[in-house]
């Protein structure tokens, strides 16, 4: 499969890439927001606070509105580097499956973004859910999902563009 990043960039070739990128960022951001909310609510519940389902759903909805912009910015920055790198690497690192390259690149990119953000944040971690290895791993699963979506869409588009 030829690498479509070797071809001339035209508006017709950039537009679908932007939509693929936005789909990956949107999915990762929404999933990550829900994951971090549930991790934080589990910590509150472990301290003995009652959390009825209605409150859990309301808090999740509020975080989708309130946390999503900040997390979306972090995801966007991470994916601006990770996904083009994956698109370039995927056809070149056989025998690794191309979708695995996209998923891994997205997770590594977001993991690095967490590290950079934490280095500059005034508190120990910018996102409370990433205080533990298990919380970080759960958050990175959202990036894996976004990477898989971008990879599947990009590979499908590349077959049609080639």
Regions found by a protein language model. Name each.
Residues 2-162:
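Juxtamembrane/disordered regions of integral membrane proteins
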């Amino acid at each position: 499969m030829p690498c479509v990043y070797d071809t001339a960039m035209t508006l017709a070739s950039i537009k679908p890439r932007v939509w693929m990128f936005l789909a990956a960022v949107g999915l990762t951001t929404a999933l990550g927001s829900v994951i971090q909310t549930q991790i934080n609510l589990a910590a509150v519940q472990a301290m003995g606070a009652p959390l009825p389902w209605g409150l859990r759903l309301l808090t999740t909805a509020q975080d989708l509105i309130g946390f999503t912009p900040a997390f979306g910015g972090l995801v966007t920055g991470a994916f601006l580097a990770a996904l083009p790198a994956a698109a370039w690497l995927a056809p070149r690192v056989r025998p690794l499956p191309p979708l695995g390259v996209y998923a891994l690149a997205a997770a590594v990119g977001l993991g690095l973004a967490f590290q950079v953000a934490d280095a500059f944040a005034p508190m120990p971690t910018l996102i409370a859910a990433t205080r533990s290895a298990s919380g970080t791993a759960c958050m990175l699963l959202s990036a894996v999902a976004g990477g898989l979506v971008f990879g599947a869409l990009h590979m499908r588009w590349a077959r049609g563009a080639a």
